[in-house]
Amino acid sequence: MIIGIGNDTEAISRVGQIVARQTKFMDSILTPAEREQALERKGKHFHEFVAGRFSAKEAFSKATGYGIGEKVHWHDIEILNEPNGRPIMQVKNFRYKTYVAITHSGDFVNTVVIIERLTILERLSLKFFPKRGVL
């Protein structure tokens, strides 16, 4: 059952300007693994990546209704890419399933996050087969 949907849009150039001006912005927003993936990218792809992660974390905060900082912090949310490029969101101490979509068009990035309550079968699957995930 879907329990939350969040959406966010950011101007990639604006996030790029923030990264250039505020040296600690990336450290405060991105986890170490996300920073590593970001630094593998060059030019506009670097800014798209950082803006996408920032936007996705904002969308997550909207989907939960918590905001960032109250119950969830920037580093509690990690979005890494699978080998095929699909972003996967993991949230510390969060018992619900999350889905994230990140898309870029021109100077904008748009993200959507969906939060779903797991069925009992899915929860048992995660408990007994944690590396395998949901059946």
Swiss-Prot record:
SUPFAM superfamilies: 4'-phosphopantetheinyl transferase
Alphabetical keyword list: Cytoplasm, Fatty acid biosynthesis, Fatty acid metabolism, Lipid biosynthesis, Lipid metabolism, Magnesium, Metal-binding, Transferase
Ligand binding (Mg(2+)): D8, E58
EC nos: 2.7.8.7
GO cellular component: cytoplasm
Main location: cytoplasm
TM ranges: none
Top-rank lineage group of the source organism: Bacteria
Subcellular location: Cytoplasm
A GO term for molecular function: holo-[acyl-carrier-protein] synthase activity
Keyword check for Cytoplasm: yes
GO biological process, one term: fatty acid biosynthetic process
Cofactor(s) demanded: Mg(2+)
Function (record text): Transfers the 4'-phosphopantetheine moiety from coenzyme A to a Ser of acyl-carrier-protein.
Protein name: Holo-[acyl-carrier-protein] synthase
Species, as recorded: Leuconostoc citreum (strain KM20)
Lineage: Bacteria, Bacillati, Bacillota, Bacilli, Lactobacillales
